[in-house]
Amino acid sequence: MNKDLKGLYAALLVPFDENGQVNEQGLKQIAQNAIETEELDGLYVNGSSGENFLLNTEQKKQVFKVAKEAVGDKVKLIAQVGSLDLNEAIELGKYATELGYDALSAVTPFYYPFTFEEIRDYYFDIIEATQNNMIIYAIPDLTGVNISIEQFSELFNHEKIVGVKYTAPNFFLLERIRKAFPDKLILSGFDEMLVQATISGVDGAIGSTYNVNGRRARKIFDLARQGQIQEAYQLQHDSNDIIETVLSMGIYPTLKEILRHRGIDAGLPKRPFKPFNEAHRQTLDQLIAKYDL
């Protein structure tokens, strides 16, 4: 516990069968691929990329357990436990903490127009119940929740709120957060903006495409930190070509198809997501070949 949490993480994909059940063997393969093949520093488990909000509580626990079994103590593990049901978030947080996850993360409560005080207390309640470190998951495009610099300050006053997963295009706010809180962890959540985020001083990044493009992301991150911006941007252009094509075909089914191409039992997306559209097969094959995926 309490490892240095800086670095690059796969936002772990989760394979499902045709009945929407977790494929445990495939999940272990996906986790091991992220660490052994993509050479990432850790896993961010049960986030958006794991289709978390389509899972019941027992399935979420199953994913936490299997991911931990797959990689053990070799890498850093962050458990996303956020839920509209605070009791579930606490239950999941306790479970992940008992499994040995290095930190918790929680998406801001969404759908209902919660006040900041309600959002703040949601985080404080999870921390009090689990006594684990917390990383705020800020993703306003999906939650509709925008946290101001003043509100970040109030959250960061809690010693166990150690950082933020920042998935937002507002680089002015990112710069303000970095300047105001130099000792807090900032992990970028936008794969397509890794160069810009690194220049802005983030400590690492969490990405869904890092499941298949992690080595290229590592080069981008390292080059940008070394001031080799032109070289980093060239690789970012390549990554964004990959991302743009993947998004056009459906992100989760397409990433799973790339993993399947590697011999990994990557399963299906969970309904109502649809499986990979075979009409895109030629485009996918060309993408894999061109970018050595």
From Swiss-Prot:
Q: Which residues are the active-site ones?
A: Y137 (proton donor), K165 (schiff-base intermediate with substrate)
Keyword Transcription regulation on entry: no
Give the EC number(s) listed in the UniProt record.
4.1.3.3
One GO cellular component term of this record is: cytosol
* Binding-site residues, aceneuramate: S48, S49, G189, D191, E192, S208, Y252
UniProt biotechnology annotation: Introduction of a non-canonical amino acid into the protein alters the substrate specificity of the enzyme and achieves levels of activity toward a new substrate that are otherwise unattainable by mutagenesis to any of the canonical amino acids. By modifying Phe-190 to a 2,3-dihydroxypropyl cysteine, the formation of 3-deoxy-2-heptulosonic acid (DHA) from erythrose and pyruvate is significantly increased.
For whether the record's keyword set contains Lyase, the answer is yes
Any GO molecular function? N-acetylneuraminate lyase activity
Q: Name one GO biological process term.
A: carbohydrate metabolic process
Could you list this entry's UniProt keywords, alphabetically sorted: Carbohydrate metabolism, Cytoplasm, Lyase, Schiff base
Question: What is the activity regulation comment for this entry?
Answer: Strongly inhibited by sialic acid alditol.
What is the purpose of this protein?
Catalyzes the reversible aldol cleavage of N-acetylneuraminic acid (sialic acid; Neu5Ac) to form pyruvate and N-acetylmannosamine (ManNAc) via a Schiff base intermediate. In vitro, catalyzes the reaction between fluoropyruvate and ManNAc, albeit much less efficiently than with pyruvate as donor, leading to the synthesis of fluorinated analogs of N-acetylneuraminic acid. Variants are useful catalysts of reactions between fluoropyruvate and unnatural aldehyde substrates.
PANTHER family from the entry? N-ACETYLNEURAMINATE LYASE (PTHR42849:SF1)
Question: What's the subunit arrangement here?
Answer: Homotetramer.
Report the protein name in the record.
N-acetylneuraminate lyase
- Which species is the source of this protein? Staphylococcus aureus (strain NCTC 8325 / PS 47)
